[in-house]
Amino acid sequence: MTQEPMEGAEPMEGAEPMEATLPDPALASAVLEVEAHVGREGWDQPARLYALVDTERFVAAEPRMAEAMGIAETVVPGSLTAIEQEQYPAEQPVEQVLETIVWPPTVDGCCVVVERLVLPPEVDAEIPEDPAEAATFAREHPLRQEVRMVAGATRAGATYCALRLKAHDNEESVVDGTDLVPGLVELVLATLHDADDTGVQA
């Protein structure tokens, strides 16, 4: 678990912000399903990355895998299926990993799951500039909160997030919306852009 403050988590301190755009229901459903799935496995997990693919196309292309996942006979038109990717080295920050990824055209979207320590806005001025010192500061601060963040996006530009505090570890307390973690959302969206010479295809 990476232990440093992350920009964009402040909405956990209050009510869910008003959405500037209506969410994509297929993406929202996929993100919430991933959050619930990861949530059942507990805390202190490494970051996880999922490709999102059109369910009907996935069933047609990979019928055996779809059947093993229990979706071959329950296809909802327009829905997205999350397919977990291989884990990368735990010592490599997820932000760096996302900067190297370019998805193939068959992938319609993606989402990433990370755990972070976050602090309330009133202590921002006290956070050291040095990353190592900032991590120690967050880890030892009495007002720290552990939060799981799921950020997803599609090639069409839709985004959706789900956040869960360890202190309120139940599905009813999950906060969701289109842009709750802007920095992470931007990195996820960037993986869906056209490939360039520096990208590594997932």
Model-derived segments and their meaning:
Residues 1-31, 39, 67-71, 193-202:
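Actinobacteria-biased recognition of intrinsically disordered, low-complexity terminal regions
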Residues 33-87:
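N-terminal interaction modules that seed assembly of large macromolecular complexes
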Residues 48, 58, 69-70, 106-111, ...:
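A contiguous, surface-oriented mixed alpha/beta subdomain in the mid-to-C-terminal portion of proteins
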Residues 48-52, 80-82, 108-118, 146-153, ...:
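Ordered hydrophobic segments in well-structured contexts
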Residues 79-145:
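Internal, well-folded beta-alpha domain core
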Residues 121-202:
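Glycine-rich, aromatic-bearing surface loops/beta-hairpins
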